[in-house]
Amino acid sequence: MRPYKPEDYAFRFPNAFVNQVWSGRIPPRIGREYKITTSGRCGGMAFASLDFYHLALPVPTVKTQDFAPASVPPDGHPLSDYIYTRQLHSMLTSWRGVLNGLRFLHWSGLSPQRLHQKSLDEERKAVESLDRGRPLVLGLVKATSRGLTAQGVNHQVVGYDYRTNESGQLEFLVYDPNEPFDASSNEAYQVILRRAVDPDNAELPYELIRPGRIDQWRGFFVQHYRPRVPAEHVINA
């Protein structure tokens, strides 16, 4: 299959979505008004990115500056709504997504040692997929409990290649929805997922390295993903 290139398939805006889950009054009509929101659509952005890859079309080139003062397309915009739909598919509203969501819950409650061992198995699965030319979605685990409210710290990225660095360490090249592609930059897009250099950090043995920042993770797994063809108004957004 053709290579996945961030300049073609990484979105040009960050994962700064706010999802309006529910709003209303408690008690109804006469009570105080409440709003429940969640932050981010990393899974939707990762899934949508791969959808465009499988379609052999670049993602829409809309960028942060197009939506000022916001930094992302608003609700009602074709691309925003498609990403939201794919966010739900990634964890909730498809049987593959349910499996992903359940694995996030289960793995979040594992001991550091058990989670690390399972993540090593997932490293091998990821390498095998990439050797076949198949980019994949990786679920990054940071939560330390199986509570639903704890799951917001977990994350989803696209793994599109791997390499061995000068120290012999395996590194995955990823598209991180939190790190948008900047078409105006002369620097190559580079975000790396690898085992942490500090061997004593048993609690957080993986690190995601992006420009100016390193995030630490408990482990990761290869997610279930199935391509979907976006509607024409999404492709042309």
Language-model features: locations:
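Cysteine-nucleophile protease catalytic domains, especially the papain-like/related folds used
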Residues: 6-119
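Short loop/turn segments at secondary-structure transitions that flank enzyme active sites
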Residues: 19, 48-53, 144, 163-166, ...
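Structured loops at beta-to-helix junctions and adjacent beta-edge loops in soluble globular domains
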Residues: 16, 45, 141, 175-177
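Active-site-adjacent substructure of cysteine-protease-like catalytic cores
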Residues: 115-173
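Cys-His-centered catalytic/binding microenvironment captured across papain-like cysteine peptidases
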Residues: 148-154, 163-237
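Extended, compositionally biased low-complexity polar/Lys-Gly-rich tracts
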Residues: 83-106, 136, 157, 172, ...
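N-terminal low-complexity, intrinsically disordered segments
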Residues: 1, 8-28, 189-195, 228-236
